[in-house]
């Protein structure tokens, strides 16, 4: 995959070249999307819209730390949707990991989560965020146990992941209407890189065959059900719903 690669670390140690080789990235000076290694982290920038800033994965500080400490925990909609109850903490495959937010929330309340991400740039961002998270004194211990990244296409990986999870979670890219600055900024940069999930409808059936208990699909409230398969079961929040489908028991 081609992207503009920029090293702002000033160390000259070739770390960016190693990273590019690992994820199969080729430097393209004219690409509007840039993957930038800063002294702090790896980030994605849209070069023709510098005001949008850089997008990076941060499990330790910022919004994710606030959500972990002051969010709803088990009361969050995603936790309810996957079926967390009492001692039951399902094993989850997040087949559309993105920036890992929902996966992190589930891991923070005790679930083991395997994140699938097919885009090599997004996978590199997730891997960078995980490395910093694993090294953190406060969350590193449980994060290493509960949150993992698998760089693979969901459409193929969903048929051969072992062991089978109890829950498969899907949050395919869907055009957003929200006006919130953060969503607009992230979605604009993100969609410039990966585009809409045009094959997302094809995820539902393999997900249902893989999950032993249920499949949860996050949708904007205005979006039709995935693959146009309606379900009466959903957790509804302001702006979103989490559609719930039966899996395939062992």
UniProtKB/Swiss-Prot annotation:
**Is Ribosomal protein among the key words of this record?**
no
Q: Name one Pfam family in it.
A: SAM_MT
- Which UniProt key words apply to this protein? Cytoplasm, Methyltransferase, rRNA processing, S-adenosyl-L-methionine, Transferase
Q: Which GO terms describe its molecular function?
A: rRNA (guanine-N2-)-methyltransferase activity
Stretches assigned to coiled coil: none
Report the superkingdom from the record. Bacteria
Q: What is its EC number?
A: 2.1.1.242
Give binding positions for S-adenosyl-L-methionine.
101-102, 117-118, 153-154, 171
Which top EC class is named for this enzyme in its record?
transferase
According to UniProt, the reaction catalysed is:
guanosine(1516) in 16S rRNA + S-adenosyl-L-methionine = N(2)-methylguanosine(1516) in 16S rRNA + S-adenosyl-L-homocysteine + H(+)
Extract the InterPro entries matched here.
Answer: 16SrRNA_methylTrfase_J (IPR007536), SAM-dependent_MTases_sf (IPR029063)
One GO cellular component term = cytoplasm
Q: Where in the cell is it found?
A: Cytoplasm
What exactly does this protein do? Specifically methylates the guanosine in position 1516 of 16S rRNA.
What HAMAP family does the record point to? 16SrRNA_methyltr_J
Q: Tell me its family.
A: Belongs to the methyltransferase superfamily. RsmJ family.
What PANTHER family does the entry give? RIBOSOMAL RNA SMALL SUBUNIT METHYLTRANSFERASE J
Q: What is this protein called?
A: Ribosomal RNA small subunit methyltransferase J
What is the originating organism of this protein?
Escherichia coli (strain SE11)
